[in-house]
């Protein structure tokens, strides 16, 4: 089983997955978890990943281009298009049953952690297969939901 996590905070994600059951599962080779710093896929020297929404709207969203380049890099390494989940408050609610269904269907997943007001809709339309929510509340980013899902999946 492999999970790739696209995030602005890979160190935080790694810290939450370096010990306990997940850490042991990684050490024993039961699960491969790779974090990807989205800023590494920018083309500007400031490594900026946010911008105003295409077509207008309030706040800033994560730009489509660095997200797409990161996603494409993961798919190229895998040699195929990988099922991609955006951790979103608008998605279907994550339950044990949802985790079981995804585990039965996919050996490799990409989890996308959003920030700001969300992710550019063009990236969602082009690359994301489904959106998953951990509940009816707002967090500062998608890292905690991604780690929660990973714990469910690896347990």
For each predicted feature, which ranges?
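N-terminal nucleotide/polyanion-binding subdomain common to many enzyme families
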Residues: 1-75
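Conserved small/polar residues in nucleotide/adenosyl-binding loops
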Residues: 150-155
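S-adenosyl-L-methionine/SAH cofactor-binding core of RNA-modifying enzymes
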Residues: 63-115
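Short, glycine/polar-rich helix-capping loops at beta-to-alpha or helix-loop-helix junctions
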Residues: 117-124
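Surface-exposed binding/hinge segments that line
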Residues: 136
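Short amphipathic alpha-helical face segments that pack within enzyme cores
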Residues: 62, 66, 144-149
